Amino acid sequence: MPRTKPIVAADARAATGNRRVLRESFTVDTATATLVREQSGRRAYTLLLDGVESSYVDLDDPRLLAFEYVRWLGDVLDCLAPTGRPLDTLHLGGGAASLARYVMATRPASSQVVVEIDGALVDLVRTKLPWRATKKLRFRVADARAVLDKTRPTAFDVVVRDAFLNGMPPSSLRTLECAQRVREVLRPDGVYLVNVADRSPFAATGVELAALLEVFSDVAVISEPAVLRGRRHGNLVIAASDAILPIEAISRRVADGGVQGRVRDRQEATAMSRGHRALRDAEGGSAG
């Protein structure tokens, strides 16, 4: 049985603009999870963890990526390989598995593993937001770094890190040693994608970049202009690879959306990393 416990009645409703939404909240292992269904005729849900938006899932069309940073992640994937070509993907951090569903819908032959530390959250998502049964998509309830450290070399085309605990990525997933391990797990032309929440002067991003620039040959940063110019807090997506990233293609793709993304190349990423050094496992970043 799912370990989730509803704490708000399933028919509780709230008005949001001209829409009426259905809210249902649950206690899970690491947070209070709230599912918000838009009453638009579609089976579209937003997952909030402790009141913060975590994932958006449209069960009728998993190709719809409503959160801009998740769309940028999908954009990078779509620039890496022709439509339909499998991209075996390891997801460090699960949420409602928006990106994994997108990959399953657009590249159904891809093998994917989603690692989520919160077992009750996985139960909730499996029950309330079910995905099409397939052996190509597996969930593992475990510590993401521990799974990464046990993954065989060259097992994946893509590794995606989108894991947060108390508003921050776990330290064990931010270290130089973690980046080195990701590089080992990736195939030679593989790509590591990292979601960072930050604002100017980009201290968190600088630490991430210091590690990734030391490990990978090419690194780029994607965000919206208002964030990059220091006007507000927001998401930054970092792409790192030993292959040359298709910067021009990614730039065109991320600029074509509701919120136009901008790409900073390796040279600009290096400038963002100045004054920062990589975190090490010995400093408290080990999965232990």
Stretches found by the model and what they are:
Residues 50-52, 161, 243:
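Generic beta-structure capping elements
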